[in-house]
């Protein structure tokens, strides 16, 4: 339930990035603020999840630390990527497509760092394949991320939760 969708998200990025010849930005480059609501939502959600995982780990509650990761991977694969696919599939390279690649790349790298204590091998494999020059060679040598590094938008998160709820009710 957790690892295969995460691997598929990684595979999706790598497949389309290779087809388009996209290369990730240099290490340390901040993800530009995107006008796309889905980009802003997934980055905000990732920042919230980072905080939840850190708080649970600080309380030595590892079971509680994993729960937000499971939900986040579901949001990433079943909401963000599914609703962003057409942005990756466009034949022309434009700013929107580039931002989609940059966002997904940044999200997957951060996810590797957050999840590394719980699933070290897949985190390492994905990280090593996505890292750029200037980043530590191993996810386990990188600093553990803290919340606040990404732009939070709690109002957008609340709006998206309502949309997800409506879509979920319509599917039933």
Predicted regions and their residues:
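Short, well-ordered beta-strand elements within core beta-sheets of diverse protein domains
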Residues: 53-55
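Acidic, turn-prone loop/beta-hairpin segments
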Residues: 19-51, 82-171
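Core structural elements
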Residues: 1-14, 36-49, 65-87
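Short helix-adjacent coil turns
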Residues: 57-64
């Amino acid at each position: 339930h957790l690892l295969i969708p995460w691997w598929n998200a990684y595979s999706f990025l790598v497949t389309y990035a290779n087809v388009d010849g996209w290369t990730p930005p240099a290490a340390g480059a901040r993800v530009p603020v995107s006008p796309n609501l889905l980009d802003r939502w997934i980055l905000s959600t990732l920042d919230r999840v980072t905080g939840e995982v850190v708080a649970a780990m600080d309380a030595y509650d590892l079971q509680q630390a994993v729960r937000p990761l499971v939900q986040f991977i579901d949001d990433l694969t079943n909401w963000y990527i599914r609703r962003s696919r057409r942005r990756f599939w466009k034949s022309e390279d434009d700013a929107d497509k580039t931002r989609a690649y940059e966002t997904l790349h940044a999200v997957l790298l951060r996810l590797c760092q957050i999840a590394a204590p719980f699933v070290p091998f897949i985190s390492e494999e994905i990280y090593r394949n996505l890292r750029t020059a200037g980043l530590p060679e191993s996810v386990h040598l990188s600093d553990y991320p803290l919340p606040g590094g990404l732009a939070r938008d709690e109002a957008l998160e609340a709006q998206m939760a309502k949309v997800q709820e409506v879509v979920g009710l319509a599917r039933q």
